[in-house]
Amino acid sequence: INSICLLPSDGGVCRGRFTNYYYNSRTRRCETFRYGGCGGNANNFHTLRQCQATCYSS
């Protein structure tokens, strides 16, 4: 699995209200989380498809 996908969800430091996706390594699924718009880490995807393409093994 890509090491990015092992990072915890991180909403960042800004106060926006964006619904993005992250890979939850406990459930082994891409799930939604609230992203503030800046900061955070690389386990942060705009779409479910991007998350799945990066984190699901083929």
From Swiss-Prot:
GO molecular function: serine-type endopeptidase inhibitor activity
Pfam families reported for this sequence: Kunitz_BPTI
SMART domains tied to this protein: KU
Keywords: Disulfide bond, Nematocyst, Protease inhibitor, Secreted, Serine protease inhibitor
Site positions per UniProt: Reactive bond: 15-16
Domain BPTI/Kunitz inhibitor span(s) in chain numbering: 5-55
Signal sequence range: none
SUPFAM superfamilies listed in its UniProt record: BPTI-like
GO cellular component terms, A-Z: extracellular space; nematocyst
Disulfide feature: 5-55, 14-38, 30-51
Highest taxon of source: Eukaryota
Subcellular locations according to the entry: Secreted; Nematocyst
InterPro entries, sorted: Kunitz_BPTI, Kunitz_BPTI_sf, Prtase_inh_Kunz-CS, TFPI/VKTCI-like
Similarity comment: family membership: Belongs to the venom Kunitz-type family. Sea anemone type 2 potassium channel toxin subfamily.
Protein role: Serine protease inhibitor. Shows activity on trypsin and also shows a weak inhibition against alpha-chymotrypsin.
UniProt-recorded name of the protein: PI-actitoxin-Axm2b
Source organism: Anthopleura aff. xanthogrammica (Sea anemone)
Lineage, broadest ranks: Eukaryota, Metazoa, Cnidaria, Anthozoa, Hexacorallia
